[in-house]
């Protein structure tokens, strides 16, 4: 493949004079390019919605969401995966981020790590990939061998696969059941896909993980009601969530949370139904953890 033909590798005619610009104009040019990203992502929303439903289906069937990528794309997957346990109260390992070259590549580039299809397959084998898992391949270029190898192995293993790329009709898109391709155009700095392409991928990942967790019962209204209250800030947030969801006072909310070990969902259910902590937990379990269903039935 001639990489120079990729949209993400071409030169941007709006930024040909970066090195001659005064700083205010320099940052203005970057900002003007960034405004294009949301529209590019908007054009992919039907495919993002399919990916959200596939991710939720994977979780409901006992599977995992597995991101894999190289460089910036890999780091973004690891970032999104690492935020899921504290935000949604899910166990570590339910959402996984793989980066070509292993964990060391998060901090320092591992040259050549992305060029092996076999490495992508091997990393999934090491995770004991199961057919109920969802594998999301991330590559701004859309042609990273590590990701192609992983997606190919995942499909052969019976997994649903998603490809996120910033070039149209990319090789990884052809390897996946669902292709999400926000075409953000040439980067302000030629070929530096940590810029618009990275922003677009982050926006897509935000929707996939958050949307899947909504469908998995981890959200009530727009509150992260399965959040783990592990520090002072989060204990305060837990109290505010109970107050906002129920209309009770702060002191009463704190008293309920102390009875639930600061778990928000049973505290809200207790406040709105009069159940005790044990009964609230039992009712939530009967509705697979969906707070709205527990309140309505």
UniProtKB/Swiss-Prot annotation:
Domain called SIS: residue spans:
55-218
Disulfide links within the chain? none
Q: Which domain of life is it from?
A: Bacteria
UniProt GO molecular function? carbohydrate derivative binding; carbon-oxygen lyase activity; ether hydrolase activity
Which residues participate directly in catalysis?
A: 83 (proton donor), 114
> Its function?
Specifically catalyzes the cleavage of the D-lactyl ether substituent of MurNAc 6-phosphate, producing GlcNAc 6-phosphate and D-lactate. Together with AnmK, is also required for the utilization of anhydro-N-acetylmuramic acid (anhMurNAc) either imported from the medium or derived from its own cell wall murein, and thus plays a role in cell wall recycling.
SUPFAM superfamilies recorded = SIS domain
- Give the PANTHER family listed for this entry: GLUCOKINASE REGULATORY PROTEIN (PTHR10088), N-ACETYLMURAMIC ACID 6-PHOSPHATE ETHERASE (PTHR10088:SF5)
Quote the catalytic activity from the record.
Answer: N-acetyl-D-muramate 6-phosphate + H2O = N-acetyl-D-glucosamine 6-phosphate + (R)-lactate
List the keywords (alphabetical). Answer: Carbohydrate metabolism, Lyase
Q: Name one Pfam family in it.
A: GKRP_SIS_N
Report the pathway entry. Amino-sugar metabolism; 1,6-anhydro-N-acetylmuramate degradation; Amino-sugar metabolism; N-acetylmuramate degradation; Cell wall biogenesis; peptidoglycan recycling
What's the gene? murQ
Q: Which organism is it from?
A: Salmonella typhimurium (strain LT2 / SGSC1412 / ATCC 700720)
Q: What else is known?
A: A lyase-type mechanism (elimination/hydration) is suggested for the cleavage of the lactyl ether bond of MurNAc 6-phosphate, with the formation of an alpha,beta-unsaturated aldehyde intermediate with (E)-stereochemistry, followed by the syn addition of water to give product.
EC number(s) recorded for this UniProt protein: 4.2.1.126
Its protein name is N-acetylmuramic acid 6-phosphate etherase
- InterPro entries per record: Etherase_MurQ, Glucokinase_regulatory_CS, MURQ/GCKR, SIS_dom, SIS_dom_sf
Q: Which GO terms describe its biological process?
A: 1,6-anhydro-N-acetyl-beta-muramic acid catabolic process; amino sugar catabolic process; N-acetylmuramic acid catabolic process; peptidoglycan turnover
| Membership in a protein family | Belongs to the GCKR-like family. MurNAc-6-P etherase subfamily.
Induction: what does the entry report?
Induced by MurNAc 6-phosphate that releases the repressor MurR from the DNA. Repressed by MurR in the absence of MurNAc 6-phosphate.
Subunit details: Homodimer.
């Amino acid at each position: 493949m001639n990489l120079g033909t990729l949209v993400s590798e071409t030169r941007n005619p709006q930024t040909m004079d970066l090195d001659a610009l005064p700083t205010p104009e320099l940052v203005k040019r970057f900002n003007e390019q960034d405004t294009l990203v949301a529209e590019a992502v908007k054009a992919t929303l039907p495919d993002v919605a399919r990916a959200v439903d596939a991710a939720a289906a994977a979780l409901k069937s006992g599977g995992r969401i597995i991101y894999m990528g190289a460089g910036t794309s890999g780091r973004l997957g690891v970032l999104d995966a690492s935020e899921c346990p504290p935000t949604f109260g899910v166990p570590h390992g339910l959402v996984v981020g793989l980066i070509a070259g292993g964990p060391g590549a998060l901090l320092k580039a591992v040259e050549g790590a992305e060029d092996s299809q076999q490495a992508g397959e091997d990393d999934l084998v090491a995770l004991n990939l199961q057919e109920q898992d969802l594998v999301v391949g991330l590559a701004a270029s859309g042609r990273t061998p590590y990701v192609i190898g992983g997606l190919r192995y995942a499909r052969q293993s019976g997994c649903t696969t998603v490809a996120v790329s910033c070039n149209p009709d990319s090789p990884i898109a052809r390897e996946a059941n669902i292709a999400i391709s926000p075409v953000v155009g040439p980067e302000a700095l030629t070929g530096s896909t940590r810029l618009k392409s990275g922003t677009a991928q982050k926006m897509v990942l935000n929707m996939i993980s958050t949307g899947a967790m909504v469908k998995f019962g981890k959200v009530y209204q727009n509150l992260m009601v399965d959040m783990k209250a592990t520090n002072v800030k989060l204990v305060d947030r837990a109290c505010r969530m109970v107050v906002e969801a129920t209309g009770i006072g702060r002191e009463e909310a704190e008293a309920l949370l102390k009875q639930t070990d600061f778990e928000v969902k049973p505290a809200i259910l207790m406040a709105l139904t009069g159940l005790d902590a044990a009964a609230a937990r039992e009712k939530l379990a009967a509705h697979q953890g969906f707070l709205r269903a527990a309140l309505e039935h």
